[in-house]
Amino acid sequence: MAVGKNKKLMKGKKGGKKKVVDVFTKKEWYDVKAPSYFKKRQVGKTPVNRTAGTKLSADGLRGRVYEMSLADLNDDESTFRKVKLQVEEIQGTECLTNFHGMSLTTDKLRSLVKKWRSLIEAFVDVKTNDGYVLRIFSIGFTKKQANSDRKTCYAQSAQKRALRAKMVEIMQREATCDLKEFVSKLMPGTIGQEIQKKCQSIFPLQDVYIRKVKVLKKPRFDVSKLLELHGEAGGVTADKGKTVAKSGEFVEPKPQTSV
């Protein structure tokens, strides 16, 4: 049996122990701020590497996308809607975000599917009045009629086409507004209720929802519009009207009334 060196039992090792450095010592934290049409504005904090040389920390934050429950943003009990927010501008230590998408949770979608019913899905690309191009997906299920004794409630092919056409028509009509107003329609689910009401004459539907919203294209970035969206129109603050001394300018001190 050949006897060799056991490296694990060797007393001496080349070099010392590697110094463990906590990576978070090189990071700083920023507040993530939601638009003003949500009840809860401060939604969390996010870390980013500190500014080093020509690499700014703000550049690492712009474009980040955060996904959170709509229930956390609006203090609502309906927890099956998820909202995506994208960072568009940095102001101090705050990340100003804008709407980037919406979807239903997987468990909610799975719970909707049942036997003996037809699934109706439709999608359409729309353009809002302020230049956002959105792709909207809707979903619905046929409902058993009140005077029917049949076990199933399947819709015929012609009825399915008519239902999809009506869905597309309503989604296009509801999107003829700006993005802020459209998001306010998404949150309570009024578009799904409108589809369910208008499709009643074709075939009764139930469990109608806007399943997903994607932002395909955004208009040219405008800081003033983003500040207005966050309730800070034009960047006006409470310090408006104060006389601010320029750097290097002499300011005469006020006389002291007492020593």
Swiss-Prot record:
From what superkingdom does this record's organism come? Answer: Eukaryota
What is any one GO biological process for this UniProt entry? translation
Keyword Cytoplasm (UniProt): yes
- Residues passing through the membrane, by range: none
Coiled-coil regions, chain positions: none
Name the UniProt key words of this record, in alphabetical order.
Cytoplasm, Ribonucleoprotein, Ribosomal protein
Short name of any one Pfam family annotated for the protein: Ribosomal_S3Ae
Give the subcellular location. Answer: Cytoplasm
The protein's matches in InterPro entries, at most eight in alphabetical order, are given as: Ribosomal_eS1, Ribosomal_eS1_CS, Ribosomal_eS1_euk
Q: Which PROSITE patterns does UniProt cross-reference here?
A: RIBOSOMAL_S3AE
Single annotated GO MF: structural constituent of ribosome
The family annotation for this protein states:
Belongs to the eukaryotic ribosomal protein eS1 family.
Could you give the subunit structure recorded for this chain? Component of the small ribosomal subunit. Mature ribosomes consist of a small (40S) and a large (60S) subunit. The 40S subunit contains about 33 different proteins and 1 molecule of RNA (18S). The 60S subunit contains about 49 different proteins and 3 molecules of RNA (25S, 5.8S and 5S).
In Swiss-Prot or TrEMBL terms, this protein is called Small ribosomal subunit protein eS1
Organism, as annotated: Monosiga brevicollis
